[in-house]
């Protein structure tokens, strides 16, 4: 069975219904460390303005007091990749695929199923906070590595920020899809292309119930097709040809 890893997104959009929120035990030290920061320190930790930090402080306080609403993570996150992922009108098989084979890597919650109920928050691995003297990456690494050890065939749709939390010995075993567009005879890639394509790729996987590496190579989605010539054992290239 294939296991897919995807990143979180800064942009969030709550979609009813909401649920009671319960913070995982491993996330509590992070919440406590963030709660100790002054508003100015919080702004520096997030690299945001004081006004935005004030909003985040209220969110953190609500989480700490058990007053936050929670939403399925794949519905709450609303970045470019998530907007290009099929999230509504899923068949039971597609919903099962999304909830049992796709996991979200979070700097606040750890590695969670896509349907895990989470609260609105702002957090990534660039957040400047230490937990018992450790960076966020080092704090989560043992748990991330254990996940990689327990899941033998990982398909990584992670950016460097999230991938680097894992030890390199696990990273080198993954398959990492790469997405490029042909423009004026040249192959181009940038974050917008990659984010949109990740969502379309994952949609194709759940719609086709992809379970093998060979099936990944047969996928066609949003104009992208697998390119045998560029691909390696661990990097699968998908190219969108000029029309």
Swiss-Prot record:
It comes from the Bacteria. InterPro entries: YaaA. One of its GO terms (biological process) is response to hydroperoxide. GO terms for cellular component: cytosol. PANTHER family: PEROXIDE STRESS RESISTANCE PROTEIN YAAA, PEROXIDE STRESS RESPONSE PROTEIN YAAA. Belongs to the UPF0246 family. HAMAP family: UPF0246. NCBIfam families: PRK02101.1-4 (NF002543). This is UPF0246 protein SEQ_2141.
């Amino acid at each position: 069975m294939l296991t897919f890893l995807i990143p979180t997104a800064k942009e969030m959009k709550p979609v009813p219904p909401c649920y009671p929120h319960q913070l995982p035990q491993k996330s509590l030290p992070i919440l406590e460390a963030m709660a100790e920061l002054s508003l100015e320190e919080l702004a520096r930790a997030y690299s945001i303005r004081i006004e935005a930090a004030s909003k985040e402080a209220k969110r953190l306080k609500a989480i700490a007091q058990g007053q936050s609403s929670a939403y399925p993570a794949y519905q709450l996150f609303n970045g470019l990749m998530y907007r290009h992922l099929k999230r509504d009108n899923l068949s039971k098989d597609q919903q099962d695929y999304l909830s049992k084979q796709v996991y979200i890597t979070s700097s606040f919650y750890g590695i969670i199923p896509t349907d895990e109920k989470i609260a609105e928050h702002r957090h990534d691995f660039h957040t400047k906070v230490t937990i018992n003297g450790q960076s966020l990456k080092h704090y989560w690494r043992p748990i991330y590595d254990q996940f990689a050890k327990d899941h033998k065939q990982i398909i990584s749709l992670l950016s460097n920020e999230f991938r680097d939390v894992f030890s390199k010995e696990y990273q080198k075993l993954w398959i990492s899809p790469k997405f490029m567009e042909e423009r004026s005879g040249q192959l181009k890639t940038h974050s917008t292309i990659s984010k949109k394509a990740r969502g379309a790729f994952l949609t194709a996987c759940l719609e086709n119930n992809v379970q093998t590496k060979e099936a990944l190579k047969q996928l066609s989605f949003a104009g992208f097709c697998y390119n045998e010539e560029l691909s390696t054992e661990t990097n699968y290239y998908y190219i969108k040809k000029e029309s």
